[in-house]
Regions:
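Basic nucleic-acid-binding interfaces
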Residues: 1-89
């Protein structure tokens, strides 16, 4: 399901699913990936409502530029449920 993604988006997806997880995945990269994969809306506080594969999740914008480990776990779960995975998985 990742064939229509740009190289940049595929790289971000790979880093989300990598073990051990990367500590330097930027929020803007995650947001761009999610916008390429599904429907994304942003509220006035900067939180994203993401709909992928019929499921909707709300992601809170991190305080820094990088996403934390818990958000990476949440992203893996959300993406896996929607049928997305890193290449070779």
């Amino acid at each position: 399901m990742t064939t229509n993604l740009s190289n940049r988006h595929r790289d971000t997806l790979e880093r989300i699913f990598s073990h051990p997880s990367s500590g330097n995945i930027e929020w803007r990269q995650v947001r761009s990936l999610l916008e390429a994969l599904g429907a994304v809306t942003e509220d006035h506080a900067g939180n994203l409502t993401v709909t992928l594969g019929g499921e909707t999740e709300v992601l809170r914008r991190p305080h820094g530029k990088d996403v934390d480990q818990q958000m990476i776990v949440d992203l893996r779960r959300m993406l896996a449920r929607a049928g997305f995975a890193a290449a070779g998985r």
